[in-house]
Amino acid sequence: MHCVPLFCFLWFCHHLYYSQAVPIRKVQDDTKTLTKTIITRINDISHMYSISAKQRVTGLDFIPGLHPFQSLSDMDQTLAIYQQILSNLSSRNMVQISNDLENLRDLLHLLGSLKSCPFDEAGGLSALGNLEGVMEASLYSTEVVTLTRLQKSLYVMLQQLDLIHGC
């Protein structure tokens, strides 16, 4: 008689434990799919390849470089910086990629909330300040360097999404 409530409780706990794993996997898969979509969009922009990756462009130090991500929050902060830079570029392609980055950041936040991870505010945004002067002086170079670095960061992010099990 006492076993029935215990069995029901254990069944309920078992159901809760396994029901959470499915949404996390789905959100993670959606995150990877959107990341691949953004990479494909960047590949489709043909003018990106007209500047060598080895060529140095001065004055664009505000664009994040390639670095490993330690957490979902790191990914979000880097994407927030790229999103702000792209939103200042007027090309139609940049608007689409910026919107995709916003959706990707939303997925990262959802993934973080499912894993009970705290997210820091995107601190690098205030350091960007007013980009209009730099953008006017070298709009094309800014676009090319931003897309090149974003694409490399997305590849790293794609590889590390499976490796980040905690926050």
Swiss-Prot record:
Disulfide bond annotation, renumbered to this chain: C117-C167
Gene Ontology annotations of biological process type: activation of protein kinase C activity; bone growth; cellular response to leptin stimulus; energy reserve metabolic process; intestinal absorption; leptin-mediated signaling pathway; lipid metabolic process; negative regulation of appetite by leptin-mediated signaling pathway
Name used for this protein in its record: Leptin
Keywords for the protein's UniProt record, in alphabetical order: Disulfide bond, Obesity, Secreted, Signal
Signal peptide from the UniProt entry: 1-21
Keyword ATP-binding appears in the UniProt entry: no
Gene Ontology terms for molecular function: hormone activity; peptide hormone receptor binding
Predominant cellular place of this UniProt entry's protein: secreted
Cellular localization per UniProt: Secreted
Job of this protein: Key player in the regulation of energy balance and body weight control. Once released into the circulation, has central and peripheral effects by binding LEPR, found in many tissues, which results in the activation of several major signaling pathways. In the hypothalamus, acts as an appetite-regulating factor that induces a decrease in food intake and an increase in energy consumption by inducing anorexinogenic factors and suppressing orexigenic neuropeptides, also regulates bone mass and secretion of hypothalamo-pituitary-adrenal hormones.
Species of origin: Sminthopsis crassicaudata
GO cellular component labels: extracellular space
Family to which this protein belongs: Belongs to the leptin family.
